[in-house]
């Protein structure tokens, strides 16, 4: 499998051939259709995030098709088109059950805690909790923005600001 790999902080990533990932128990392997490039990726390979270990395949914004199912996965089928949030909760703890996976003590983050989506394939853990089906009519370049940027904005507007259906919001600026 071809992948972009960061071997050393601050150096240019390189394209390498790596072994294909295996589906972990409760997880899946995705064939990556498209992946995003985010400011967080820059911080990871610049060495600004002390949780990132090297070598690492970056990438946390993705859309792809389920290529393999791990033991116990029930919510998706092989071939299904999906995306995933940047912060992937365990799906079992009280935070995940309350919809707050971003504070899950056992969260994972593709491209940070394990190899990410700048590859032909990526392993996703806790698939039944983290995968979101994506319609065939949605363009991949739009879908890759959903897992990080959209999810961040959506939670800020709904959970923090209390915005409800029918209300109006003005977006003054955006960036990363």
Set out the residue ranges of the language-model regions:
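Glycine-rich beta-strand-centered segment in the early N-terminal region that forms part
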Residues: 19-35, 48-94, 135-138
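Conserved glycine-rich cofactor-binding loop
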Residues: 175
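Cytochrome P450 core scaffold surrounding the K-helix E-X-X-R motif
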Residues: 40-46
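Short, conserved catalytic or interaction motifs in soluble domains
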Residues: 8, 71, 98
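NAD(P)H dinucleotide-binding glycine-rich loop of Rossmann-like/cofactor-binding domains
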Residues: 90-172
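Short N-terminal binding/cap micro-motifs at the start of the first secondary-structure element
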Residues: 10-15, 39-40
């Amino acid at each position: 499998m071809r992948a972009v790999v960061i071997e050393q902080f601050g150096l240019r990533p390189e394209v390498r051939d790596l072994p294909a990932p295996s589906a972990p128990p409760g997880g899946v392997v995705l064939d990556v259709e498209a992946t995003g490039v985010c400011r967080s990726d820059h911080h990871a390979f610049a060495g600004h995030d002390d949780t990132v270990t090297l070598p690492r395949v970056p990438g946390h914004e993705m859309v792809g098709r389920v290529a393999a199912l791990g033991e116990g996965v029930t919510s998706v089928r092989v071939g299904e088109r999906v995306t995933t949030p940047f912060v992937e909760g365990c799906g079992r703890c009280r935070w995940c059950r309350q919809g707050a996976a971003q504070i899950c003590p056992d969260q994972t983050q593709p491209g940070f805690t394990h190899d990410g989506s700048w590859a032909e394939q990526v392993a996703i853990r806790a698939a039944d909790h983290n995968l979101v089906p994506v319609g065939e009519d949605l363009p991949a370049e739009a879908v890759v923005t959903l897992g990080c940027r959209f999810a961040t904005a959506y939670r800020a507007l709904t959970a923090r600001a209390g915005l409800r259906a029918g209300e109006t919001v003005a977006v003054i600026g955006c960036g990363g």
